[in-house]
């Protein structure tokens, strides 16, 4: 599915694809030097709380080192009179709120008690980007996205939709197209402080029924 989508995008003249690893600093630096981006949107990461329990090294490499490399590239975009990065937009996660039971979440809530490595690293990303913003005047916008849903890939392939925890968990789900629209709007300018959820958690099986 990803390869098919990539083939569709190749028809656009302004589209470029570079296959690489976020944790490879040389690759990130070369991309910034070649394309000189004014707006950077970082959605690249190893996602998921469960997988971080059994594969912690993957999260440290992709989500911690990879994000650091992005920040450093933004910082050095100012070097030698080059056009600097004007705005960094990146995805965080609602998991940074830990076991907070108050809904809806607020940007004023404390987020210093993560309950997973994934959440801890995402919070680390937020703190690090804040420091870089203050030190190097890099405008940064964090998107504390809620759980995405969009089952079309599995439906097209005739696969079973997997529901964890017997469908008993509840979460604020966000449709993937709404996430895309939100990212595009944020790219145009930093918004007011707001979370991407409505405070109406529902079990995943209710979302599946919509399909």
Labelled PLM ranges:
Residues 1-142, 177-183, 187:
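N-terminal Rossmann-like NAD(P)+-binding domain of SDR-like oxidoreductases, especially those catalyzing
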Residues 169-171:
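Heptad-repeat alpha-helical coiled-coil signaling segments
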Residues 25, 161-162:
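Short C-terminal boundary/hinge segments that cap the last helix of small helical domains
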Residues 61, 83, 162-165, 194-197:
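Short, hydrophobic secondary-structure boundary micro-motifs
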Residues 59, 105, 149, 210-211:
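Aromatic/pi-system hotspot detector in well-structured domains
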Residues 88-92, 206-211:
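Extended hydrophobic secondary-structure segments that form protein cores and membrane-embedded regions
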Residues 134, 149-161, 173-210:
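Alpha-helical substrate-binding/gating segment
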């Amino acid at each position: 599915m990803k390869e098919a989508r990539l083939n569709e995008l190749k028809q656009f003249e302004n589209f470029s694809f570079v296959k690489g690893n976020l944790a490879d600093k040389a690759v990130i630096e070369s991309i910034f030097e070649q394309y000189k981006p004014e707006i950077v949107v970082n959605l690249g990461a190893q996602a998921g709380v469960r997988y971080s329990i059994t594969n912690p090294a993957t999260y440290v490499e992709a989500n911690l080192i990879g994000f650091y490399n992005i920040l450093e590239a933004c910082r050095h975009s100012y070097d030698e009179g080059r056009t600097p990065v004007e705005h960094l937009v990146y995805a965080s996660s609602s998991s940074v709120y830990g076991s907070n039971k108050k809904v809806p979440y607020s940007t004023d809530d404390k987020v210093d008690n993560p309950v997973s490595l994934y959440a801890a690293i995402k919070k680390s990303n937020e703190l690090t980007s804040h420091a870089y913003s203050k030190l190097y005047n890099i405008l940064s916008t964090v998107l504390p996205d809620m759980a995405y849903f969009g089952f079309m890939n599995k439906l097209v392939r005739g696969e079973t939709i997997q529901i964890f925890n017997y469908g008993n968990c509840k979460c604020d789900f966000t449709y993937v197209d709404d996430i895309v629209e939100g990212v595009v709007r944020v790219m145009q300018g930093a918004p007011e402080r707001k979370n991407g959820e409505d405070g109406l958690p529902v079990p995943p099986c209710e979302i599946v029924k919509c399909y």
